[in-house]
Amino acid sequence: MYIDTAELCDIYLDQIDVVEPIFSSFGGKSTFFGKITTIKCFENNGLISEILEENGEGRVLLIDGGGAVRRALIDANLAQLAADNGWEGIIVYGAIRQLQQLENINIGIQALAPIPVGSDEQSIGETDVPVNFGGVTFFPDDYVYADLTGIILSQEPLDLEEFDSL
C-alpha cells in the first residue's frame, strides 16, 4: 500500500508525532507502516533475532540501541529473517551493516548509520517497553509510518484508504 508521510502530516498533524530527521532508509522497501513492537538493547542482537522469529504481519520492529553506531544491530541475515516472517519494517536507533544485501531484501529498514562491525549475539535487553528517541516516546502497540521523507508516530491506526487510489 502506498503511503506518503508528508500527506499524512497534512491530514493528521494534530494526532501524530513526527520523529526528528535523523534516520536514513536502507532496506529494499522505501515505505512501510504497522503496529510497533519495541526492543531496548545495547550492541547485542540475540533478543532481536528471537523477536524476528515471530509472525510480523502488520508489525514494525522498533529497536532502541541507545543511538550507538559502534556495532550493527541488523545485518542481512536478520533482515531476511524479518522479511521471511512477514515483518513490515525495522527502525533501528543504532547501526546496521551489509548495505548491498539489505537493498535486495523486501523489507523497510531505517537506521542511523551503517558500520561493518557486527554485534554480540547475547539476548540481553527488554521487549515491549516504552522507548524514547528522535524527540518522541514510542509505546508498544503504537503505529508508525515511514517513507523516504520521514517517520511519524500515532497512538491509533491512521485511515489510509484515500491512498489506495493513488
UniProtKB/Swiss-Prot annotation:
Pfam families per the UniProt record, alphabetical: RraA-like (PF03737)
Assigned keywords, A-Z: Cytoplasm
GO biological process, one term: regulation of RNA metabolic process
UniProt GO molecular function: endoribonuclease inhibitor activity; enzyme binding
HAMAP family named among the record's database cross-references: RraA (MF_00471)
Subunit structure: Homotrimer. Binds to both RNA-binding sites in the C-terminal region of Rne and to RhlB.
Protein task: Globally modulates RNA abundance by binding to RNase E (Rne) and regulating its endonucleolytic activity. Can modulate Rne action in a substrate-dependent manner by altering the composition of the degradosome. Modulates RNA-binding and helicase activities of the degradosome.
Family the UniProt entry places it in: Belongs to the RraA family.
GO cellular component: a single term: cytoplasm
Family annotation (InterPro entries): RraA, RraA/RraA-like, RraA/RraA-like_sf, RraA_gpbac
Protein name per its UniProtKB record: Regulator of ribonuclease activity A
Species: Histophilus somni (strain 129Pt)
Compartments reported by the entry: Cytoplasm
The keyword Cytoplasm is annotated on this UniProt entry: yes
SUPFAM superfamilies: RraA-like
